[in-house]
Amino acid sequence: MTAEPPDDHFDLRTRPWIPVRTKEGASSIGLRDLFLDAHRIDGLAVALPPAASGLMRVLCAMAARITTLHTASNNDDWQDLRYDLLEASEGFDPSSVDAYLGEHGSRLRLHDPIRPFLQDPRLVDQSPNRSGVNKLVMARPAGSNQVFFGHFTDDEQVALPSAEAALHLIAQLYYGPSGQCTPRTVSGKRFGNTVAGPLRRSLSYHPAGRSLFETLLLGIPAPGTWPRPGRSGPVGTAPADSCPWEREELPDPLAPPSGAVGPLSALTEQYQHAILLQPGPDRESVVDATITWAFRENRPPHTDPFLIWDETKDGTLRARDAEAERSLWRDLDALVLMNRGDSGKRPLILDGLVGGQIPEAAFRSLRVSAYGFDQDRQTRDRTYFSASTPPLFALLETSEEAGDNVLALGVKEGREAAEKAAQRMEFALRSAWRSYTTPFSDDKPGRNGKGGGPWPGVALAAYWPAAEERFWDSLDSGDFTHALSSFGRLALEIYDEVTRPVASTPRGAKAREGARGLVRSLLDRSTS
């Protein structure tokens, strides 16, 4: 009879829970194998984008510890160390990997009875009511929410494999909702509401190298972007820069939370939720979960290095929202241009990846992976998505010569031209539809102005995929000189196709031709 294996409380160092891609295919591995074989792994294969986004931050923080890139006497020394590590391409030092994972072994167990990974064991007493495992899984409906991804109900909770639960735990900590939550009582004070996770509704951009080893090193923020101790409170009161699993004490839920004081806390310690998973008897699955508030106040803000920051009307900076209908290429100029013509900022992580700061081979293979979660600011989750760019070295390579920025500026002009053509086409189709469908007795300007009809939606669904293909063709050729006429011609073709069914009727032909000039003028303007 085979002996039962010892209970390791689902040790994340050795249990297979992180999906990765290699030349042999996809598989799942633990933290130890991930770091030891990172230079032989192509990249992560996490199917849940919000989990992939959060996991990248966790892994980059661990990589910083293992390589000592979490410390820096000055920026030049830090850049030199990273350059040498990338150039050697030998992977992470095995002894450093084992030393780090060994030091924090008990904190890297998903179901550890004392300090489970990224969880708060105090919730056993402070929050006796459970939230349900459905609440943990963002794709499952909970409470009275609508069913989108599967038929799950609160009356019948379906257990989740522990390997999957670890990923959903990370996703909740970074993208969790605000508003009502399972109540928690601390020192006699009971509250049942929380604020949103730090990345809620955001679009996160991560540099991607030829291997996971390169990707993790490229994803460690440079010293010039680190938050500094003392910015979130009186000098000398800020805690040391650490990850949650490294700290000896759990934070006081009723005290004001500390801000980020360095790269480690900036990457891993911005959560606003407290979570505790309830494992099944075999600890191979999660059968219940408690999700509640971690602090009564928001953490002090900081500039996340993986987000695009746009300037609002009042001059403040705000992270760009994730929009499922907006393709990655439309954000490309905001990724590559350091000066966009306003006070907006590209992701700070890209500022340290220009030519000369990393080896040439790594630079010429550099891509960007994007992870987005289209949500509102409270509880509604729409959909999540991921995308990747081709190599960006031609756009990121800049110098003091003005000619080096021509292609990057062309990307911006191309995107603006595509959006202008889309807006003009949509407006023209709305106008044509109103002219075609307005009753003769009400055929006056301003009537039924809100009705756009079905044409704009049909046209935009055809336009954006075709515009994306045309954009990449222009980028490949390195020429955006005639971008407006190119996208205008595409918009005109789609306008004609969508309105063709009514062109044979007098009223339809009149409506069609009356608005067609709005799109046709793009061709005239681009050639004038």
At which residue positions do the language-model features occur?
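Beta-propeller folds
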Residues: F148-H151
